[in-house]
Amino acid sequence: MEEQGTGIRVEAMTAEYAQQARAWAERLGLPLQDDTAAFAVQVGVDGLQIQQLGPQAPGPVRVDFVEGQAAHRRQFGGGNGQMIAKAVGIAQGIRPQVLDATAGLGKDAFVLASLGCQMTLIERQPLIAALLEDGLARARADEEVGPIVGRMRLLTGNAIERMRAWEGEAPQVIYLDPMFPHRDKSALVKKEMRVFRPLVGDDLDAPALLEAALALASHRVVVKRPRKAPIIDGPKPSHSLEGKSSRYDIYPKKALKA
C-alpha cells in the first residue's frame, strides 16, 4: 500500500464530468492520477468540491450560496443588525463599497452582498478561488440568489500586491479576515479549517496586509479576529465590536455618509 502524500489530484465523480475534470486539471496545473494524493478536487453534479482523502477525513468542502448555511443566514441572520454589518458601516441609506481582501469561501462577502453592498473579493489560493468561482457561477442561475452574487466580483492573486497596484476608484471599506495561527485543537473542529490549513497555511503577512489596506481604503478598514486574539501588529484600531467567538477591529479614516 502506497503511503499518502501531500499532493492534490483532480477527479470526475462520474464519467460525464471527465471533460470538465480535465479542463480544471489543466487550468490548476494538477494531475488526474495520483494514488498518494492527500486531497482530491472533485467535479460532479454539485459542481466543484475539495475532498480530503484518508480514513479520518471530514466531508467535502464546496461553495453553495443557494442552499444550506448561506441560505439560512440570508433569511434568518439578523439583517442590518448583524455585527459584521455594523462593523463595515451599514446603516440607513449607507451601503459601502467593500473589498474583501481575504475572501476564502465567500461567506462574509455574501452576507454583505445580500445586505446590498457592492463587493470585490480577492482570494490568493488558486484552489479556494476555483471553489468560489464555481459557487458564484452556479448561484447566478438562481432566481433569488442571482441578483445578490451579481454584486460580487472575484479577483485572484496576492491581495497585498493587488491593493498596492490598485487602479481606479478605491474601495470605501476593506475587510480582512486573516487565517489566525491555531493554538489548540478546537480551532480544527470545522471541516473547512481542517481542509484549509494544509492548503493555505496561516497569514503570517497580516501586518503587511493591514498596511496595504489602510493605504488604499477611502473610509475604513475592518479586521475580523478570534475574540481573544491580539490585534495585528501596526496601528491600533479605534474601537472593536466583540461577539461570542469573534471580534471586529475597526480602523476608521473618514465617516461614511448616506
Swiss-Prot record:
Give the start-end ranges of region Disordered. 232-258
Q: Which residues bind S-adenosyl-L-methionine?
A: E123, R124, D177
What is a single molecular function from GO for this protein? rRNA (guanine-N2-)-methyltransferase activity
What does the entry list under GO cellular component?
A: cytoplasm
Checking CDD domains in the record gives: AdoMet_MTases (cd02440)
HAMAP family, per the entry: 16SrRNA_methyltr_J
Could you tell me what this protein does? Specifically methylates the guanosine in position 1516 of 16S rRNA.
Can you tell me which family this protein belongs to?
Answer: Belongs to the methyltransferase superfamily. RsmJ family.
The protein here is known as Ribosomal RNA small subunit methyltransferase J
